[in-house]
């Protein structure tokens, strides 16, 4: 959380070396304020929006341009999430931002912040690069993560308006009221208001306590003085971490206003040159001359006033003022370890042997396969391979373990064992608890052989020096030895290892106090000092801080500047400084505070002795912020991290770790912190950040197998949290872990760890198989196969079977046979019955895939025999099921049912487990299919419903999906049952929602809408409309405009059926507009026609169909030259106008339809068009034209009648012509001829009723006056344009 913003950046605001604001300046500001106008505008609140735009761009690293395909994929994914943004909300919650809206078309998010902490954390994640990686988690699916080249080549660049972000930050600062600033110029006190105003130097750090518009009350963090300061002279600290730290760890530094360090911008070590002569002011300081060489003990850090040096000429050791030496003459720290030594860096993240073993065990559990002992079921992967399985077994060793625990917990040795003092204050408790760790008193036989071993049960005479000689001799050693380590360690183990048999701590204190007196009397300097130190630590245990201070001060006086035991000197100075800080006694030892800070920060591998050292660490960090030294700030953050980890206060580590990560910049320094952050994020349940912090490190940072395996372990755990899979499910491998697993594999290859290499290859192959990518699986299994041969026969056999199985799943049967057949030959002379059975079974699957049914059956039978020999019921069941499936594919339903029923019986004998129940689901599906083929519908339904029950029992989504599909087909096509069909479609929809398959969900809602519509009740139409509208929303989210357009149309059709006419046009128009926007003319044409059909096929407002047909569909059809579509539309228009009695319009449309029918060359279409045209002419009383068109239709019929339907058509048309010519054209003789032809057609049909009707009609004509008016039987002459062969219309 130690972030800064992009534009404000890491501004180091140095004070000019030795330059103060002149006292001669006029009162008020010591420099012209016109240059500060922009800063004041930024600082004072302005009218601005609190929303921030976060834009993203998916780029290719190699091409250095936008990856258009991935950018579009991200946009589509975002579009799908725009209306259901729970997943996006959850992501930005992890990133400490509040999502306002998703703007997919603009490739951006709108976010906001309510607190300083939120904007601080978000800016940190933004600068660390975690935001862009988290967006990858959101945008891309497994196809991206499994493509290693694409992942390595892709980066998401995110951008924000940094000025706007800074303004939001400043606004929130002003809301809080209490914040920290730097003086942008020197400020002097006005002469007439002396004492009221604060005198400031440029860049001095100020704590603003309360403010007005022009002035504010403030306190200097350098001097501690309070007073008024002009607001225009202040600039808020731009780094949120600084604001947080100074607010939560208040205090002043007591530094001089002049900066005491210049020169190098790096931490120095090695040897340096003195710039001036220096005479010691205190005994612990080093005297030297200008130009003298000084060896740096530890580091020299810019920003600290002191460091520890050793004179090359005299060999003396002491404190050296930083200002007196040339920093550039030191050897700078390398970029690889800019702020700490290699040993210190390794202490931050080293997983250790225990963690490596635990992670390796987990990976082995994940890679475990039973392929060497359990037969494989044909086509079983269709049910198994689904990532969103809701219930699965968990590998051993993963139930209780947490990914970051061991290496952190290792640093908490003894930190939680506190012995409470009942009457101590909370503040004192915090200071004391680390030093007052409770300890047990071991018996002598429990102890190793210590250098000092004192029995305090015997009575000791204070006057007898002999009783105290052992401890005095032990402690009076000049300088440091390993025996003294227990004096300074965190657990104070010296007490428990060197003394025993005392009932109360007071006895121990009395013994040590007497020993101190003897040491003092005997002038035993080192024993005296160490005893004072021990008594001081014991005084802290008893909350006697003042007494402890006296002991520590006495010890320092006794040492009189001796540095032979640096651990003792550091412990004394730091403990005493902590007490000064806690008791607010800075004035008592200002120099000691600075020297204690130097001992703490400059000595590498410092071992913390007490919890109260945190006060000194924060003092040094505050000093680094005040003087603007990023190096000192980074070193202090590192020390804070180590101490807090030692105390087990992991929550408090995060801000310091994030700040250190921002300051580190270069690997491997940043890698150590990044690894630690990964574990901390995991502990805080921030899975996106935990994975991002690992992935951010990249493939180049996979150094060391233990670390790489631990990272893979952590990512695998957190990837399931990102996907929302319950923590109990570890049998699936998320594709999100693929890059990390590959890095781990590369690290193992460098170290030639073949066992772990093979394990990782098996896990990667499993991942690729889960995502239906057999080629990727084969790649890694080929490596595992080679490694298996090197490891042993068992591993080689297992790897061979896995590879063959992958080839079978990838339909590479020949390659599978190349492995399996030699493998079978090698097993013939062995007694490995089960293994031979496994190979026979896989051979059967291979032969079945090739269509070699006979050989497949023989292999399955041999596998069955081997299973029976071993008494393995499960393998027998699988063999029977495979035989049943083989015979089912060969259309031998009876045999198939027999085998499958035996398989079901065998499965019923097994103890219930998820694996066997899922196999049984597949067998029941086959048995149901066989029953359908045998027309045993009741049995089939029973099989399907039993299979679904097993899927529900184990919450196994894939099996439920397969069974539900079969049930939907069964109740829609095999044994129609609308209610049952709807029920199972609803369940299918629920499964799609659990699988987060939006496309499937949309299609199912569309199908459900149709099913409800078919019921045609008021309630079902309402439900249908709800389904269609929900599918519409999904299709719009997915950007599938064609389906969205059809959904708009479907909703409009339903509103028409529900007589909600005011909404019909709205939905139909939106459907057409959506289709037009898709730039697919064929879709627009289809929807124009279907929109017209809504009215054409209805009973209300049928005239509205004309505008969709004539104005919409016809122009599009002509533009696309879709003759048949245009013809169909004109036919509909003709029929519509006839029904509406608009015969003039009908004639226009029918004529056009007839012309188009001629152009199509389809005689059937031409016949229909001319028949409809004849009907229009008849309706318009144009009888001669009607007769001609009817005759044209007859000419289009085949010369020989081929079916009763054709004969019926002839009979009807000739009857129509007969009535027309007799009644309308008054031509009895032509009418007679037409009726005779109709009679002939009726005779061919064998329809006696029709024949009698026609004969009666002929009799009436012959007896009519019209017949007798023309006795010669001559017909009248009439035009025959069309029937005579003319093409003109």
Swiss-Prot record:
SMART domains: SH3 (SM00326), TPR (SM00028)
Domain SH3: 176-239, 267-330
InterPro entries linked: SH3-like_dom_sf, SH3_domain, SH3TC1/SH3TC2, TPR-like_helical_dom_sf, TPR_rpt
TPR repeats: 529-562, 758-791, 837-870, 1002-1038, 1085-1119, 1120-1153, 1167-1200, 1211-1245
GO cellular component assignments: cytoplasmic vesicle; plasma membrane; recycling endosome
Pfam families: SH3_1, SH3_2, TPR_8
Keywords: Repeat, SH3 domain, TPR repeat
Region (Disordered): 393-442
One Gene Ontology biological process: regulation of ERBB signaling pathway
Compositionally biased intervals (Low complexity): 414-424
PANTHER family: SH3 DOMAIN AND TETRATRICOPEPTIDE REPEAT-CONTAINING PROTEIN 2 (PTHR22647:SF2), SH3 DOMAIN AND TETRATRICOPEPTIDE REPEATS CONTAINING PROTEIN (PTHR22647)
UniProt name for this protein: SH3 domain and tetratricopeptide repeat-containing protein 2
Lineage of origin: Eukaryota, Metazoa, Chordata, Craniata, Vertebrata
